[in-house]
Every structure is written in C-alpha cells, then in structure tokens.
Amino acid sequence: MVHGLGEHSGRYERFARGMAPFGMATYALDLRGHGLSAGQRGHVDSWGQWVDDTAAFVAHVQGQASGEVVPLGHSFGGVVMLSAVRSGRLKGIRRFVLSSPALKLKAPVPAWKTSAARLMSRLAPRLALDNEVDASTVCRIPEVVSAYVSDPLVHRKISSRLYAEWRRAADDNLEHAAGIALRFLILAGTDDRLIDPAGSQELHARTLGMSELKMLDGRYHEPFNDLASDEVFAAIAKWLGK
C-alpha cells in the first residue's frame, strides 16, 4: 500500500481490517517526507526517489509474504505506483490496484500557477506551500474526518518541487498508459471532490484493455474510509479472485 499526499500508512488500518476476512494481509509504508519517515514534510527532490522507495518496499514485502504480492497506490500514491510499474522495477508483480489516482485535480489550476510552480521548483525547490486539501472532502464519515484533522502525522504541505514533479509524472503516465503491460484495477468515486474521476476514466480508455475501471457511486476521495467500504473491499477481493 502506497498512501497519498500528506497522510501516512497508519490511516490504512481500516483497509487492512476490511481485507483480512478475504485472507489477505496488508503491508504499508510511509513515503519519505511523510508519516514516520525522514525528510522535509511534503517534499521530494525528484519523483524517482518515491519510485525508489516503492520498488524497495515491494521487494521487501515479497521477501516476507508467502503468496502473491499485489501493490496498491492511493491518490498521489497511485501516480507513484504507475511510475514504478512503468519503470519495470517491480519484479515478479503480475497486477496492481489504483485508488483515486491523482491524475487530474478536481479544481482546475490556473496556467500561471502551474508555470510559477515550475519556476519555483528550480529557484526554491523546498518552498513549502499549503496543499489546500479540505478535510471534509476525504470521506462522508465525520469520525474519520475528525481523526484526519487531529492526526499529528497528517500534514498540509507540498513543496514547489513536489508539485512540479507530480504534475510531470501524472501527465507522463497518462501519455504512455498504452504501454502498461500488467493488468490493473482502478477504483474511483463519482463524487470525489479532490481528484477528478475523469483522470481515471482517461487512464482506463488509454490502457488497451489492461485495466478494469470500477466507478464507485457517491463515494468521496477515500473509498476505503467512506460509507459502505465493505462493498469496496469485496470488489477488490472479487477482482483478485479472477
């Protein structure tokens, strides 16, 4: 499990409990700059560092687990997962899962702001900006939202370098989606207010039959933490059983 921007692996305990009845164990990491891992909060020098982290983590899990390892990436972690798969470094992996991959933002970013971020990525790469995530949009369960807000390991930072690296990686993964040679499942909430589900639909359309897209009616950004999450866990288990 590779988490999204500003969060950490501990937020996936609900996911782990949901998949356990299907005989599946969950392993998760904190990307550098997140959770208990070292590094400036919300910063990465290059997208390749997160790809390195993911490849090393998958290899570690393969050394621990007795069965098939199926990587899953959520939101920003979904883009990292796509980059890692396309890099060819996830040896022995046959398929993977994406949850609300952050390919397109729901709120359009003005062109001037994107250009400014690219410039600042070169001039002041560690400049910390607010990631502008509205906690009320992560899911529809008040207790989960409250826990997200009060979680000391959740942060609201994104550096100018990370923003520029993410934008480049998201565009690159969409452009080269036809080259993905592994089967994968895409989960996207129809009412996601952070990430535009149109990005998932475009990815699916470009993958030449390698992906299965499941649009989750009424779900917000975090389907594993939202209402009726048991249905999502069952859908993943069903896909894995094919």
Task: Describe the residue ranges of each PLM region.
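The conserved beta1-alpha1 loop
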Residues: 2-4, 74, 188-189
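Catalytic active-site module of serine/aspartate enzymes centered on a nucleophile-bearing elbow/loop
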Residues: 210-242
